[in-house]
Design a protein with these regions (language model features):
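Activation segment signature within eukaryotic-like protein kinase domains
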Residues: 119-120
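Protein kinase catalytic-loop region centered on the HRD/HxD motif
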Residues: 125-135
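Protein kinase glycine-rich loop
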Residues: 19-25, 30
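Structural helix C-cap motif within protein kinase domains
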Residues: 210-214
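Activation-segment/catalytic-loop signature of the eukaryotic protein kinase fold
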Residues: 82
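AlphaC helix of the eukaryotic protein kinase fold
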Residues: 48-70
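Conserved short submotifs of the Hanks-type protein kinase catalytic core
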Residues: 86-100, 104
Length: 324
């Protein structure tokens, strides 16, 4: 690993003692640190030297800090502090004890329908809250969603949030946003919106239950063209057991025309909630039975909710165990 701006045991701004290097990305290093004031472990994200030299990247980092710091929701990674150290901007986030959905997908291949619905319900809650506070995430994908050991999801990386006028393909085929999850209108140069976030949620839902994205190719331009021109694939081709109620939600999210998608995340969340309140409908052989036993739902609802929460906990623990 290349040299970083902070060393193990170094103390940033007389408060954050570096414990370990948690990871690194294209823009920043992420450190595990101990807050000497609160006596809690935190994550410190600091821009790379080459990244900090670029004014656009600095602006993005500042926007991420402002956007995320303005949000206080149980399903959003909380920003605790921001500052500058040795000339490099940093932000302090809550430390997430878990793994990204992408990491779990790489190990398990896909999630069960019940697990995926629970995750999507929580994600809709987070995005709905962000939208209500004027923040468009613009980079929703499994890599930016953490699953904690208690089954709670945490949405992070608001690095391009609210960059509503910069959604275009550049000359070097790069995009502001991840092209596999990018709504067709964004690649055509239109502004980001709640509906473009909903499109990305739908793509993520598809990936959770199939283990792959619906459109992929050799270049960003090719993939963007597929989102724009090609018919959305039949989900059951990749997972034949997909219940109609789940497929219907994904198809509505991923309509080419934003007007034909869910008007907001609350509508999508309500559809998912119907499934979670009666998870038997996820199994085709039980759907007819469950239709005639609706009176039992209120009595069994608490048990069912506990079951799908335990399923998520099991998924997180299994993924952690297999990575060791």
């Amino acid at each position: 690993m290349e040299d970083t701006q902070a060393a193990i045991n170094e103390i940033i701004d007389d408060r954050y003692k570096i414990v370990d290097i948690a990871g690194e990305g294209g823009m920043a290093f992420v450190y595990k640190a101990h807050d000497l004031v609160t006596d809690k472990d935190v994550a410190v994200k600091m821009l790379r030297p080459e990244t900090a030299a670029n004014k656009t990247n600095l602006y993005r980092f500042e926007r991420e800090a402002r956007a995320a710091a303005s949000l206080n929701h149980q399903n959003i990674v909380k920003v605790l502090n921001v500052g500058t150290y040795k000339g490099f901007p940093y932000m302090v986030n809550e430390l997430i004890n878990g793994q990204t959905l992408k990491q779990i997908l790489d190990i398990r291949g896909k999630f069960s329908f019940l697990e995926a619905c629970d995750i999507m319900y929580q994600l809709c809650s987070a995005i709905m809250y962000a939208h209500q506070h004027g923040v468009i995430h613009r980079d929703i994908k499994p890599q930016n969603i953490f699953l904690t050991q208690d089954g709670t999801i945490k949405l992070g990386d608001f690095g391009i949030a609210t960059f509503q006028n910069s959604a275009h393909i550049t000359q070097n085929n790069s995009m502001l946003g991840t092209v596999q999850y990018l709504a067709p209108e964004i690649s055509r140069g239109q502004n980001a919106s709640e509906q473009s976030d909903i499109y990305a949620i739908g793509i993520t839902f598809f990936e959770l239950i199939t283990g792959r994205v619906p459109f992929d190719g050799d270049t960003a331009l090719v993939i963007a063209a597929m989102h724009t021109k090609e018919k959305f694939p039949n989900i059951k081709k990749f997972n034949p057991r997909t219940p109609d109620c789940v497929a219907k939600i994904i198809y509505r999210c991923c309509q080419k025309d934003p007007v034909e998608r869910y008007p907001d995340c609350e509508y999508m969340r309500k559809d998912i909630e119907k499934i979670l309140k009666n998870p038997a409908i996820l199994e085709k052989n039980k759907s007819f039975f469950s239709f005639f036993h609706r009176d039992d739902q209120s009595r069994d609802q608490r048990r069912q909710e506990k079951e799908h929460r335990n399923a998520l906990k099991k998924a997180a623990k299994e993924a952690k165990k297999e990575r060791k």
